[in-house]
Amino acid sequence: MTQSEPTEQKRAGRPFPVSWDQFHRDCRALSWRLNELGPFHAVIAITRGGLVPAAIVARELGLRVIDTVCIASYEHDKQGELQVLKGVSDQTATLGGGTGKGLLIIDDLVDTGKTGRMVRSMLPDAHFAAVYAKPKGRPLVDTFITEVSQDTWIFFPWDTGLSFQPPLKDGAG
């Protein structure tokens, strides 16, 4: 039996479960900060993780134009090479003058910064916001709400279900 390389989740080590209520509160807190920095012409969600926070932020800021940039970097819980599956539409890019000025990029998490760098290169003047930030990715975002350590794995509510959790004393992480 060959030993496989540990996944990002296993290497991260520190679980950080986030409930729907907590995520919604954090997205509203992000919206409060962003409201002072606008106005913005459109929201661009980095999919898939940025879809839910983008919807909440767009509602809170009264933005009707919502676009996506689709970049794949994780396959389940293992990070791989980045792939642009869909870029920002020409219509949205035009709203930002081609450089992103007045556009708001939203993601759930900035981790290593690889995805952020790629999107930043597409729209260098856009405002980049994330709900959560890790130290390696933090310099790439303009606004975030909560910083977690680099060795933390965030369990987002759309990736989890209700189940029994053993007590910490029994070896639960």
From Swiss-Prot:
Catalytic activity from the UniProt record: GMP + diphosphate = guanine + 5-phospho-alpha-D-ribose 1-diphosphate; XMP + diphosphate = xanthine + 5-phospho-alpha-D-ribose 1-diphosphate; IMP + diphosphate = hypoxanthine + 5-phospho-alpha-D-ribose 1-diphosphate
Role this protein plays: Purine salvage pathway enzyme that catalyzes the transfer of the ribosyl-5-phosphate group from 5-phospho-alpha-D-ribose 1-diphosphate (PRPP) to the N9 position of the 6-oxopurines guanine and xanthine to form the corresponding ribonucleotides GMP (guanosine 5'-monophosphate) and XMP (xanthosine 5'-monophosphate), with the release of PPi. To a lesser extent, also acts on hypoxanthine.
One Pfam family named in its UniProt record: Pribosyltran
Enzyme Commission (EC) number: 2.4.2.-, 2.4.2.22
Species of the source: Rhodopseudomonas palustris (strain ATCC BAA-98 / CGA009)
MF annotations from Gene Ontology: guanine phosphoribosyltransferase activity; hypoxanthine phosphoribosyltransferase activity; magnesium ion binding; xanthine phosphoribosyltransferase activity
Keywords in alphabetical order: Cell inner membrane, Cell membrane, Glycosyltransferase, Magnesium, Membrane, Metal-binding, Purine salvage, Transferase
GO cellular component: plasma membrane
Annotated residues for binding of Mg(2+): 108
Amino acids binding xanthine: 111, 154
Family according to the record: Belongs to the purine/pyrimidine phosphoribosyltransferase family. XGPT subfamily.
InterPro entries for this protein: PRibTrfase_dom (IPR000836), PRTase-like (IPR029057), Xanthine_Guanine_PRibTrfase (IPR023747)
Names of required cofactors: Mg(2+)
Pathway it works in: Purine metabolism; GMP biosynthesis via salvage pathway; GMP from guanine: step 1/1; Purine metabolism; XMP biosynthesis via salvage pathway; XMP from xanthine: step 1/1
Recorded superkingdom: Bacteria
Name of the protein: Xanthine-guanine phosphoribosyltransferase
SUBUNIT field: Homotetramer.
Membrane topology: Peripheral membrane protein
Biological process (GO), any one: GMP salvage
PANTHER family: XANTHINE PHOSPHORIBOSYLTRANSFERASE (PTHR39563), XANTHINE-GUANINE PHOSPHORIBOSYLTRANSFERASE (PTHR39563:SF1)
Residues that hold guanine according to the record: 111, 154
Binding site for 5-phospho-alpha-D-ribose 1-diphosphate: 48-49, 107-115
